[in-house]
């Protein structure tokens, strides 16, 4: 790894504890998790106890009040160990900020401590069978009926969807208003009418549960609306840059790990009486 000055000694101490935790609690089991299609639920509560979830959440809501670099450390160590099934970052760095930034005080106190502890696993339901990167095209609707919103629609390719206890649902509260008709809602998994479809098989990241979600006349209190009705698209645009950053951090860490594993292999693998790393063509390829 290229030496960096970005992280303090405290960050590096945290890194050591994260790596130790993952090597004990995740690495030995990841192969089995890939077969079953999701990680064991107890890993979440153990990670919460270890301070690895939502470390940036303020202390008043149960977090450590730490900076984003602590999240970056967790993402990097997961990537370097090849633990592609662990969806901590989506939970901590994507879902939690929506609640922190746009949720009422009541919602923050109700949910954030449970996210920090790992009692609740979270997901965000944006993608639909007919709407992916075009979030203005979502068809899921939320209609106000008295003191409740009634949600109908379906979502797909939802990371953490199978284990999720709480989901942020992107829905249209005014289908005719375009981007200004989109809103965000918190929906608990045991809400009547909310069901989970099959876990989707993927080419890679097989231990990361990815599911379909269905909403049929799902009623949620209007207090579960995040922020203002119709402002959901703006909130998504505000928060998505951090999501992209977490993907970049994880991708770079995984690439560094892949290079390191390749170097180790080429030094150990012998051909024609010497390590294949000593062959000129191998060196050219590794240099590239």
Question: Predicted segment positions?
Answer:
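Short Gly/Pro-enriched turn/cap motifs at secondary-structure boundaries
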Residues: 88, 115, 130-133, 157-160, ...
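A short core secondary-structure module
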Residues: 147-148, 152-197
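A structural signal for short hydrophobic beta-strand segments in well-ordered beta-sheet cores
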Residues: 140-143
């Amino acid at each position: 790894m290229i030496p960096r000055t970005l992280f303090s000694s405290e960050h590096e101490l945290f890194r050591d504890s994260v790596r130790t935790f993952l090597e004990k609690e995740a690495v030995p089991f990841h192969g089995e998790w890939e077969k079953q299609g999701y990680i064991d639920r107890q890993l979440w509560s153990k990670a919460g106890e270890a301070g690895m979830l939502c470390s940036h959440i303020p202390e008043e809501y149960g977090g450590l009040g730490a900076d984003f670099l602590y999240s970056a450390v967790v993402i990097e160590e997961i990537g370097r160990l090849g633990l592609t099934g662990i969806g901590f970052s989506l939970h901590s760095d994507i879902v939690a900020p929506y609640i922190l930034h746009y949720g009422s005080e009541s919602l923050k106190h109700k949910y954030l401590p449970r996210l920090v502890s790992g009692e609740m696993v979270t997901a965000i339901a944006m993608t639909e069978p007919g709407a992916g990167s075009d979030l203005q095209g979502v068809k899921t609707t939320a209609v106000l009926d008295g003191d409740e919103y009634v949600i109908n629609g379906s979502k797909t390719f939802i990371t953490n969807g199978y284990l999720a206890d709480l989901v942020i649902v992107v829905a249209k509260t005014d289908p005719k208003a375009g981007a200004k008709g989109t809103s965000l809602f918190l929906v608990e998994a045991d809400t009547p009418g909310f069901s989970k479809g099959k876990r989707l098989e993927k080419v890679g990241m097989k231990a990361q549960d990815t599911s379909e979600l269905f909403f049929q006349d799902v009623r949620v209190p209007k207090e579960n609306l995040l922020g203002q009705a119709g402002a959901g698209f703006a909130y998504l645009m505000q928060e998505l840059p951090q999501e992209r950053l977490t993907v970049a951090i994880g991708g770079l860490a995984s690439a560094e790990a892949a290079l390191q594993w390749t170097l180790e292999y080429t030094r150990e693998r012998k051909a024609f009486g010497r390590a294949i790393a000593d062959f000129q063509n191998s060196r050219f390829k590794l240099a590239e």
